[in-house]
């Protein structure tokens, strides 16, 4: 893994180190493909602690069998209406499920949750749009690095009416793990302390902490804050 120093214009110069690695290979060549998850590079603090992708969720790729439909309906109920409609039409479906979900005709994957609980430095990190492209902050500035990952896909061989062939194992390509990431000069311990103190004293404004010897940005808290998963509510 190589390291490339890049500049990010935000209050100060030195902010991020980009880490790149080899991309995973993918396989194509079947009739029906389900995209399970498109990984995005992790944003780390200066100590390589993850500031994104720190938590996980479970995604299941489900074959359109009677047993699978019964499992989804029985365990997920109305929360899986769209997936059930797809399964009943004869197409496989990918759906987020509880980790304890059980189904004989499915593949389960643990994938990163981009923004989880206890997020820090929202204005620095920024957020992505519905298509997974960076809109603001580091997500936008390093979108070409964070977004250069092959999606995890499951490909089925199907019959003449588009239903997966019984007894034929699907082909899995790609990975849920990103091949690249960005390391910031932000220190999550300092960031957490600054955010905690400032939110009790500031309705509007910002607090910046810099390393005097180097000018590196250690923390930046801006208020009002926002959730990257509910930007419209900010």
Regions found by a protein language model. Name each.
Residues 1-233:
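Periplasmic/cell-envelope proteins involved in peptidoglycan metabolism and beta-lactam response
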């Amino acid at each position: 893994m190589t390291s490339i120093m890049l500049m990010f214009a935000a209050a100060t110069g030195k902010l991020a180190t980009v880490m790149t690695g080899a991309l995973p290979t993918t396989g194509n060549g079947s009739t029906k493909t389900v995209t399970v998850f498109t990984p995005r590079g992790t944003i780390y603090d200066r100590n390589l602690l993850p500031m994104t992708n720190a938590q996980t969720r479970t995604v299941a790729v489900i074959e359109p069998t009677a047993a699978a439909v019964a499992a989804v309906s029985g365990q997920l109920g109305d929360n899986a209406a769209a997936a059930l409609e797809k399964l009943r039409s004869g197409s496989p479906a990918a759906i987020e499920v509880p980790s304890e979900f059980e189904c004989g005709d499915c593949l389960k994957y643990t994938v990163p949750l981009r923004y989880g609980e206890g997020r820090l430095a929202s204005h620095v990190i920024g957020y992505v749009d519905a298509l997974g492209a960076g809109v603001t902050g580091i997500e936008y500035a390093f979108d070409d690095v964070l977004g250069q990952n092959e999606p995890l896909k499951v490909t089925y061989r199907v019959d003449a009416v588009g239903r997966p062939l019984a007894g034929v194992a699907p082909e899995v390509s790609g990975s849920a793990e990103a091949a690249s990431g960005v390391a910031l000069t932000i220190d999550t311990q300092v960031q957490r302390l600054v955010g905690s103190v400032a939110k009790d004293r500031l309705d509007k404004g910002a607090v910046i902490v810099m390393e005097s010897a180097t000018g590196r940005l250690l923390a930046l808290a801006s208020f009002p804050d926002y959730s990257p998963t509910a930007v419209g509510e900010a």
